[in-house]
């Protein structure tokens, strides 16, 4: 569950959020991809260490050298599957539109599926892939449409500004209280206010991101939570990444943690553990 969730914050695709960031922030794809590399590395490094030490505590072992698949043979059979990803990233990096990049990636998937001698798709498989893709597209479209209503309500009624005002006001109060007990050398009101706002915004993003698909998640967070951080002087790209990350973490954060429930169902384990 944690690993698959990390895939949504890892370049180059980032669960389709990278395409939306291009539109919202108006910056090149390369800048978004580069900004997302180090946080993704930290996420997977922390997860690797947690799994490693948990496995040592439980006495679990990995595959032996004989059981490990041969790298050369595996790469020989699987390397064509990298072609669609290279096409997608290459078109995006060249400054073309996300729509053209998606078209190039899909075309690459079809050609690789039909021509790959080690794992060739049948025409029936291709038909089923189109059918599945259409179903997913409808689901994402419906979610995006519903999110559009939410964004419209937030924008037209001024709810977004009210949320920003509440968070900033509460952050200033908390910062004032913290400044009274922290030594003068550390009592920078602006820093304390931003820290309090980040904590509250992170909590709000986790609560609002529960059970929401990646694309809709990002749209909601950008409309509701990101403006607060921008008002406090955070760079727009940093604010967008922050609210997106915490919105995605809702999938593995109790009490909802839908990804954990799905993983527990496949593993036949207790989701509460």
Predicted region positions:
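Alpha-helical transmembrane segments of multipass membrane proteins
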Residues: 5, 16, 20-24, 86-90, ...
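Long, contiguous bundles of hydrophobic transmembrane helices that form the permeation core
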Residues: 34-136, 260-273
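Residue-level recognition of pore/gate-forming positions within transmembrane alpha-helices
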Residues: 4, 23, 39-40, 44, ...
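Core transmembrane alpha-helical segments of multi-pass membrane transporters/permeases
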Residues: 99, 103, 125-165, 190-207, ...
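Alpha-helical transmembrane segments and, especially, the helix-loop junctions at the ends
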Residues: 1-30, 47-52, 209-219, 243-265
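Hydrophobic alpha-helical transmembrane segments of multi-pass integral membrane proteins
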Residues: 173-225, 243, 250-253
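Hydrophobic alpha-helical transmembrane segments
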Residues: 33, 82-83, 103, 195-200, ...
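Membrane-interfacial loop-to-helix junctions in multi-pass transporters
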Residues: 76-82, 134-140, 167-201, 230-238
């Amino acid at each position: 569950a944690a690993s698959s969730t990390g895939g949504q914050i890892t370049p180059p695709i980032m669960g389709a959020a990278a395409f939306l960031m291009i539109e919202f922030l108006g910056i090149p794809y390369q800048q978004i991809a580069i900004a997302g590399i180090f946080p993704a590395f930290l996420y997977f490094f922390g997860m690797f260490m947690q799994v490693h030490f948990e496995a040592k505590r439980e006495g679990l072992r990995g595959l032996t050298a004989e059981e490990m698949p041969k790298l050369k043979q595996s790469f020989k059979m699987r390397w064509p599957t990298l072609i669609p990803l290279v096409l997608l990233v290459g078109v995006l990096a060249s400054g073309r539109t996300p729509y053209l990049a998606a078209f190039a990636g899909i075309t690459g998937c079809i050609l690789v599926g039909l021509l790959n001698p080690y794992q060739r798709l049948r025409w029936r498989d291709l038909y089923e892939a189109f059918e599945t893709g259409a179903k997913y597209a409808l689901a994402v479209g419906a979610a995006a449409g519903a999110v559009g209503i939410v964004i419209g309500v937030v924008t037209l009624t001024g709810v977004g500004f009210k949320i920003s005002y509440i968070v900033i006001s509460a952050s200033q109060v908390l910062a004032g209280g913290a400044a009274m007990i922290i030594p003068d050398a550390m009592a920078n009101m602006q820093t304390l206010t931003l820290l309090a706002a980040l904590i509250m915004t992170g909590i709000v993003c986790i609560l609002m991101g529960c059970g929401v698909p990646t694309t809709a998640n990002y749209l909601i967070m950008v409309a509701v939570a990101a403006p607060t951080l921008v008002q406090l002087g955070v760079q727009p790209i940093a604010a967008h990444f922050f609210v997106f990350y915490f919105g995605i973490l809702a999938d593995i954060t109790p009490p909802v943690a839908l990804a954990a429930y799905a993983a527990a169902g496949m593993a036949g384990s207790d989701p509460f553990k």
